[in-house]
Structure formats: C-alpha cells, structure tokens
C-alpha cells in the first residue's frame, strides 16, 4: 500500500511531521481538494499546480482522450488491436478523431469476450501495426493524454512502440480519470468506468469498445474538472504551500531515486 509506505518513510526520515500532521493531510478537507499523502513525496507537486497542465490543455484544445483494446492484459507480450483517441474542446466535444484497428501478431483468444472482435474481424479490418502506431505517435505528439486506468494503455503502447523500433510516446502529460475520481469520490463502491457513467450525469455509457469508452471518459473528465478540480484549486494550492517546507527535502530525495531507477 503506497499510503502505508509513505507514512513509514515520513515518520522515519522527515522531521517535524508527526501523526497529527499526517492525519491533517489525510483529512476530508485535503481529500476534497484532491490530495493524497503520497503526493507530497513527489517534487513535482511543489513546482506547479497538479492540474495546471490539464486545464491549460483544455483551454487550448490540446487534450486527447485515449483508450486501447488488446489481446490481453500483459502489457509486455499482448498486442493492441484497436486505438481510439479524440482531441476534445473545453466542453468535451470532438475536435479531431483517431480510430484504427490493428492486425495482431497473436490470436485474440479469450479477450474476444471482452471487446467482441474476432481474429477474422481483425484480419479484415486491421492494418499493419507499425503504420497505425506511427500515425498515433504523430496524432498525439505534445498533447495532454487522458484515459481511464490510463497507465495500462500507456504501458502497452510503450511496449508496442519499442517492439517496432518506433521510440517512445511523445506526450506532454498524462492524467488518469480513475485516479482523479478515486481522489474526489473515495466512498463510491468502485470506480469502474461503467459505475461512474451510471453515477454521474453523463449521457454516454462505456461498452468495452475503445471508442465508446473514450466518449464516456471525455464527459466524465469535463464533469470532474468543472465540479471538483476548478472549484478546489485555491484550497489545493494553499495546502501544498503549507506543507512545502516540511516535505520538499524528502520529495527531492525521492525524485532523485526515481530518476536513478528509470535509467
């Protein structure tokens, strides 16, 4: 558990932060601002408002909502079969669309029950993976990427690009609506895309087709931005600034360790 690990590190290595201060950070007031204890272990939180890039991207029509369907859940070995992405405007409307199917290198197997595309379907409508992947890299270059559980989608994309010697994704930033809704609505029974679509006033339901899923994700993103992220911006920055002195040292050390681990 990341929060438990963060507590242990803070108590051992951060002077001036006791149990009472940790409880303050984990209080409903902080939760309403979309903050978690683990945020303060990352130097980036003291360098810019956490959602500044997302809000700027929406203003500039530079947010792309993104989802993939694949042959399985192993990001290192499974193949993407569908990429759906939509550049959106501030209200969540479509600015530009990207939807392509890929001929996978392996059978879809049991994943067909999830996305409903058979090997025969993909043999007919799928394209060469290298062509589609390269086109998506260009489509998404320097954009803010948003998805639901987007770490999976980014991870399998990164693996596919490496497999075809196409470099790495060229995103300006990445935001996860799964993480965002967990922060602002921690008491929901779960944070699956279907549950969120039924809970909040949006008019599109996900179906495990990547295109349907990004339409739902785009509407949920706009909802949480207007209802939660923007209204709590001042409170969030006040809380971050109040803890900067105590946490900037350990955050800097943790950021250095992360950089070394990524080399």
Describe these PLM feature segments.
Residues 1-4, 41-54, 153-155, 189-193:
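Short, motif-level signal for alpha-helix interfacial/capping segments enriched in acidic residues
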């Amino acid at each position: 558990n990341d929060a438990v690990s963060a507590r242990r590190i803070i108590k051992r290595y951060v002077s001036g932060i006791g149990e009472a201060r940790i409880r303050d950070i984990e209080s409903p007031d902080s939760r309403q601002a979309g903050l978690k204890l683990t945020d303060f272990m990352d130097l980036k939180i003291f360098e810019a408002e956490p959602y500044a890039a997302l809000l700027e991207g929406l203003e500039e029509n530079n947010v792309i909502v993104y989802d993939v369907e694949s042959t399985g859940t192993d990001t290192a070995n499974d193949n993407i079969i569908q990429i759906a992405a939509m550049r959106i405007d501030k209200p969540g409307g479509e600015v530009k669309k990207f939807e392509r199917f890929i001929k996978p290198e392996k059978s879809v197997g049991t994943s067909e029950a999830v996305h409903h595309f058979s090997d025969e379907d993909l043999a007919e409508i799928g394209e060469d993976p290298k062509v589609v992947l390269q086109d998506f890299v260009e489509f998404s270059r320097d954009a803010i990427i948003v998805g639901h559980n987007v770490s999976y989608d980014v991870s399998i994309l990164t693996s596919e690009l490496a497999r075809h010697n196409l470099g790495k994704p060229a995103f300006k930033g990445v935001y996860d609506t799964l993480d965002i809704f967990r922060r602002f609505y921690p008491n929901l029974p779960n944070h699956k895309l279907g549950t969120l679509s039924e809970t909040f006033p949006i008019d599109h339901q996900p179906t495990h087709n990547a295109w349907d899923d990004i339409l739902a994700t785009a509407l949920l993103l706009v909802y949480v931005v207007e209802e939660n992220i923007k209204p709590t911006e001042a409170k969030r920055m006040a809380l971050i600034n109040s803890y900067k002195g105590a946490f900037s040292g350990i955050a800097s050390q943790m950021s250095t360790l992360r950089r070394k681990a990524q080399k």
